[in-house]
Regions:
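Alpha-helical transmembrane segments and their immediate juxtamembrane cytosolic regions
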Residues: 1-266
């Protein structure tokens, strides 16, 4: 069994890998010509950065000794400042990753610490499924509604702006609640299932079985994704494969993360 300190080091390694993938994916939007296709392997690798961050966020919430949901407000505020200062756009509208992480901390802080792994996992998968059902229902809009902070031109009416917020928050913003909140709940479920919370789940045999389960899950989910795969277009120059985040992609991303965790803790 690994100590808590070792697990944190391993999470730091996963975070470092995710940061590298994120930098690669985000820089591609400015390095490559906007209307030219990006290399597929780069698109594939960059697509695993965001789910890794979300899953790790859930694991950190499950590891926290005292839930602090209000920290999510500060992260959302930073997201708003980034929108205004960097992108010069109206905040709390397109819902980039910082908004989603902040909101999930608020929603998940207490459940991640006190719910069982089973309850967290079932809720997480339900959130993933809701995202897919909304996409199947034709509610996902590929084009984002954004408002530039250009004071030379009048802003759209408040009614028009407010009408787009719920849809982009829950369905088709950069990182909508459905399905991305599900990743955080599943990350918390993974953490709740570790030996720190489940002393009976220890030993080399358990680690070996978890490794095989992770491999089988990866094969099944990636096979399903391959059978249902349609290469998505780039979205405003960003080339990750989760626009929209279909169920096959979500399950594959979780499987890759689970396999990495199993390898680290094996």
């Amino acid at each position: 069994m690994h100590s808590a300190q070792n697990r944190i080091v391993q999470y730091d390694i996963l975070s470092g890998i995710a940061i590298s993938l994120m930098l690669m994916a985000n820089s591609a939007a400015t390095v490559f010509i906007a209307d030219k296709p990006h290399p597929f392997l780069m698109r594939l690798a960059g697509s695993f950065a965001a789910p890794t961050f979300m899953l790790l966020a859930g694991m950190m919430l499950g590891l926290a000794k005292k839930p602090k949901p209000l920290r999510g407000l500060s992260i959302m505020a930073v997201g708003g400042l980034v929108d205004m200062a960097v992108w010069q756009s109206l905040p709390f509208l397109t819902f980039d990753v910082l908004y989603t992480i902040g909101l999930t901390i608020i929603v998940t802080a207490y459940p991640a610490r006190y719910f069982s792994a089973t309850a967290l996992a079932l809720t997480g998968f339900a959130l993933l499924l809701c995202g897919q059902l909304l996409q199947w229902g034709g509610l996902y809009h590929f084009e984002l509604f954004s408002v530039a902070l250009n004071f030379d031109q009048p802003l759209p009416s408040a009614q028009e702006i407010l009408s787009h917020i719920p849809r982009q928050l829950f369905i088709d913003g950069w990182f909508p609640v459905f399905p991305w909140l599900g990743f955080v709940w599943l990350g918390a479920a993974l953490q709740r299932g570790l030996p720190l919370f489940a002393p009976e789940a220890q030993g080399a045999g358990v680690s070996l079985r978890r490794g095989w389960y992770a491999v089988l899950l990866l094969l099944a989910s990636s096979g399903y994704w391959a059978m249902t795969f349609n290469l998505p277009p780039m979205r405003d120059g960003y080339s990750e494969l989760f626009y929209p985040p279909g169920l096959g992609y979500c399950l594959t991303a979780i499987s890759v993360f689970s396999y990495c965790c199993s390898s680290c803790n094996g």
